[in-house]
Amino acid sequence: MSLEEQYRTDANLNARIALHARFSTNPGWSQWLFDHEAPPSGARLLEVGCGPATTLWGANLERIDPSWKLTLADFSPGMIEAARDLLGDRADYVVADAQELPFDDGSFDVVLANHMLYHVPDRPRAFAEIRRVLVAGGVFHASTNGEGHLQEMGDLTADWWPFERHIDAFGLESGPPQLEPFFTDVRIERFDTGLRVTEVEPVLAYLRSSERYDGRDLAGERAAVAAAIERDGSFWVTTTPGLISCRKP
């Protein structure tokens, strides 16, 4: 499944979000992320790769400052439609590629890219574009994951599909060296959480939502997760989310 097919609508992404939303040992990720990314009043803010806008904005609807000039961008028209349905006139919406942003130089005070930069084919080009549309001294926040993320999911599928290591492309460890040629004051903050899953089907739905899923029945995976829940009371999944922040010089 191509990236375009994977994100044509929000269905696959929502299946993955649901696993985290239902079974996280620390359900405050959306609020933590908002607290760390929210700009001062009156700021012009762009989110690239906004998806359906549920994690950051939907979970914090009442906290959105009406003085912000909020613009949401995604390369998928389906994602933009879902974001517009959720947020209405709280934001402007643009179908756009992070590698070629349709905005003037210095248009924004803050740019966000949450859990999406590992999908971008030419990240240096995207970083150059983000730097271009930021004002001098503007802030760029990028959430992603660190080492060990979802390692138990990888163990489940190791015999037929090595689980994607998005963190190799852009993670909490691999991201900062990529950003340093473009930005200053690069720093990392980590969010302490994990998944304690007490039902089998949400894990299988997560696996089926992947671009690598080939239609198999996942009987072995079902049995392994069910056995862990029977034995331990839950199926534990390591998660290592966090945030990389930096500034335009």
Each language-model region and where it sits:
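A short glycine-rich, Lys/Arg-flanked "PGG" loop and its adjoining helix->strand segment in the class I
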Residues: 124-136
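Short glycine-centered segments of the SAM/dcSAM-binding site in methyltransferase folds
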Residues: 44, 137-139
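Conserved class I S-adenosyl-L-methionine
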Residues: 1-41, 54-58, 62, 79, 139-166
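Class I SAM-dependent methyltransferase SAM/SAH-binding core
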Residues: 44-100
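A short SAM/SAH-binding and catalytic strip from SAM-dependent methyltransferases
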Residues: 109-122
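A short acidic, Gly/Pro-enriched loop at the edge of an enzyme's catalytic core
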Residues: 99-110
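Conserved Class I S-adenosyl-L-methionine
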Residues: 3, 20, 26, 52, ...
